């Protein structure tokens, strides 16, 4: 018997701990869908409500590739996660709220003329933090997986590597910075 723990709204709705006889991690959701009334419909409709799920085997968060592995006695935990949530941007949002609070406090001091500056700065920093939390950037070239994945200097830039999905900079005047190559091709021509 494998122990399956449900977290968050799943645990509140369907019970926190379940025991099922399963051989692979991927069978946990199927076993609960067949034996717990309403579980399958809840899982199907959860994406519309802005939820996705993380599966933990023991303390390790596993991916889709690891779901087919056999159960080795570890506890399987299924935890709901809000779609689009991540850790980046939380500190920025808190810093923005602090700046707005500083602006409110400055209203009652001799430096009241500076309070609109703190309101605007705090609101901009908060908005930037919220946008950063809701729209994650693609990993792309930030995650260097091999030693061959290095910056290229072939087209005259400082570093002209860019990942898919990033904006293309528009520059007027002389270029002294790295650039993003939109399209390039190299072909070999026989020389005789």
UniProtKB/Swiss-Prot annotation:
Q: What keywords are assigned to this protein? A: Host cytoplasm, Late protein, Viral release from host cell, Viral tail assembly
**Highest taxon, organism lineage:** Viruses
Predominant cellular place of this UniProt entry's protein:
host cell
Record keyword Isomerase present:
no
Write out the GO cellular component annotations: host cell cytoplasm
* Subcellular compartments: Host cytoplasm
Q: Which GO terms describe its biological process?
A: viral tail assembly
Task: Spell out the family assignment given in the record's similarity comment.
Answer: Belongs to the lambda-like tail tip protein I family.
Q: What does this protein do?
A: Plays a role in tail tip complex assembly. The tail tip complex is assembled successively with three tail tip proteins J, one tail tip protein I, one tail tip protein L and one tail tip protein K. The tail tip complex interacts with tail measure protein to initiate tail tube assembly. The formation of the tail tip complex is completed by the addition of tail tip protein M, which is followed by tail tube polymerization. May be excluded form tail tip during maturation and would be absent from virions.
Identification of the protein by name: Tail tip assembly protein I
Q: Recite the lineage of the species.
A: Viruses, Duplodnaviria, Heunggongvirae, Uroviricota, Caudoviricetes
